[in-house]
């Protein structure tokens, strides 16, 4: 992330952005992640990043057909913004939420289950941020 360019040059605007993020953080990671994905969708719709984004309803349908569990390893070899991985994480949290109360299961969920790779370094950063906003602390990511 050393090559990241910070484009908010106005100190007052930066302060407002940070305050807004802190307010969102108090509402939970799920809301922040949803907002992040919404903004990514707006970028894709305007052609800003040139990446293909699978529509949310298609992702949801595919994950529901897969029915992922805490015993699975979830891997997306062309992860982009990590939409598929995050939908799988959401499915697991909704269907095995009680099992996530166990510390070992929680650690596995946050650090071991989710794997992804992409050939675009910017998309890797976007996907990583998306995962972290959705409570996946140490995603297993590989730049290819």
State the predicted function of each range.
Residues 48-144:
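Conserved S-adenosyl-L-methionine
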């Amino acid at each position: 992330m050393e090559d990241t360019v910070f484009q908010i040059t106005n100190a007052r605007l930066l302060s407002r952005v940070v305050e807004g993020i802190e307010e969102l953080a108090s509402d939970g990671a799920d809301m922040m992640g949803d907002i992040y994905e919404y903004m990514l969708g707006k970028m894709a719709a305007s052609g800003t990043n040139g990446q293909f984004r699978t529509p949310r309803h298609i992702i949801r349908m595919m994950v529901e057909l897969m029915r992922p569990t805490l015993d699975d390893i979830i891997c997306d070899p062309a992860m982009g913004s990590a939409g598929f991985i995050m939908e799988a994480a959401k499915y697991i949290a909704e269907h095995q939420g009680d099992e996530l109360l166990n510390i070992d299961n929680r650690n596995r969920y946050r650090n071991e289950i989710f794997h992804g790779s992409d050939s675009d370094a910017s998309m890797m950063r976007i996907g990583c941020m998306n995962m972290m906003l959705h409570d996946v602390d140490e995603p297993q990511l590989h730049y290819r």
